[in-house]
Each structure stands twice: as structure tokens, then as C-alpha cells.
From Swiss-Prot:
GO cellular component: extracellular region
Zinc-finger as UniProt keyword: no
Domain Avidin-like, chain residue ranges per copy: 37-159
Subunit composition and interactions: Homotetramer.
Name of this chain's protein: Streptavidin-V1
Binding residues annotated for biotin, in chain numbering: Y67, Y78, W116, W132, W144
Highest taxon above the source species: Bacteria
Family per similarity comment: Belongs to the avidin/streptavidin family.
Record motif Cell attachment site, residues: 83-85
Lineage, top ranks: Bacteria, Bacillati, Actinomycetota, Actinomycetes, Kitasatosporales
Purpose of the protein: The biological function of streptavidin is not known. Forms a strong non-covalent specific complex with biotin (one molecule of biotin per subunit of streptavidin).
Length: 183
């Protein structure tokens, strides 16, 4: 009797396992979605002014990398850290993300930080659309003017010199405090 009960349980568990595997839809697998977001976000990105954003997206939602500004007096690369939605919606929405750069490296300290917040939109013309806040350390009396606001669009295609000049002439602002401090 005991062998019959054990055999019946084993058959039941096998049936449940096979049924679950057969009914799983791989296109709805959240791990597949995470991999797609990771693969899409990871890489080298350029904004409209030619600044370079090199990022790695971790499976846990972490963003790590460097940012090199093409404007102002920023020298070399600055470390960035951030987060992204590692389980993005599957309805075609963008993937929410954000990162911060403290404008201090071995060459310069601007006593400021910029945060970018936006969405990664995949596809053949992948882009990251962001809004940024640049806050500089200042006295209490000048706190009212310590934060600048702007926007950047990042693509994986480096902009041409003509495109960068057009953006500058159009008055496109940037999140580089070393440029803002000189204004």
C-alpha cells in the first residue's frame, strides 16, 4: 500500500511539473524582459551635445559607469551610479531609470552633482529621454539659484559636429556644473 501511495504522489508531481512547463509562455518570462532591458541599456550613449555616457545595467537594477562631458571645463570621466526598473512593464512603455554624477574626480571638484531621470525606449532607434537637475554647493543666501534644470536625449549614435553646433546654437543646456558656473 505504501508503494502505491508513493508512486501516486510521484506521478502527480510529474504531471504538475510537465503541465506547468508546457503552459509557461516564454514571451511573458520576466527574466527574459530583464535581459532585454539590461542588453538595451548597457553600452555607450551620447547626448545632443556630444557628452559620453558609458553604462552597465545589472540584473539587480543597478546602473554603473562613467560620464564624460563634452562641454564646459570638465576633465576626463566622472563616476556615475543609478538604478533602473529591472522588471519593466510589457505593454510597450519605456523603462524608468535614473543616475547621478558627482562632479569630482582626480582632476577637478566642482562641488556639485547632476541627476538624470527618464526612460529608456528600445527598438531600432533606441534612446534615453531624460530631465536633469544640477545642484551646486552654495551659501544659504544663494540657495535659491543653486539648482538648474534641463533635458538630454541620449542615443547610441555619436552626433556629428554639425548636429552638436546646431544644438548649441539652439540654446540646448547641459548638466555640467563647470559650464554653468562660468555663466
Amino acid at each position: 500500500m505504501r508503494k502505491i501511495v508513493v508512486a501516486a504522489i510521484a506521478v502527480s508531481l510529474t504531471t504538475v511539473s510537465i503541465t506547468a512547463s508546457a503552459s509557461a509562455d516564454p514571451s511573458k518570462d520576466s527574466k527574459a524582459q530583464v535581459s532585454a532591458a539590461e542588453a538595451g541599456i548597457t553600452g555607450t550613449w551620447y547626448n545632443q551635445l556630444g557628452s559620453t555616457f558609458i553604462v552597465t545595467a545589472g540584473a539587480d537594477g543597478a546602473l554603473t559607469g562613467t560620464y564624460e562631458s563634452a562641454v564646459g571645463n570638465a576633465e576626463s570621466r566622472y563616476v556615475l551610479t543609478g538604478r533602473y526598473d529591472s522588471a519593466p512593464a510589457t505593454d510597450g512603455s519605456g523603462t524608468a531609470l535614473g543616475w547621478t554624477v558627482a562632479w569630482k574626480n582626480n582632476y577637478r571638484n566642482a562641488h556639485s552633482a547632476t541627476t538624470w531621470s527618464g526612460q529608456y525606449v528600445g527598438g531600432t532607434e533606441a534612446r534615453i529621454n531624460t530631465q536633469w537637475l544640477l545642484t551646486s554647493g552654495t551659501t544659504e543666501a544663494n540657495a535659491w539659484k543653486s539648482t538648474l534644470v534641463g533635458h538630454d536625449t541620449f542615443t547610441k549614435v555619436k552626433p556629428s559636429a554639425a548636429s552638436i553646433d546646431a544644438a548649441k546654437k539652439a540654446g540646448v543646456n547641459n548638466g555640467n556644473p563647470l559650464d554653468a558656473v562660468q555663466q
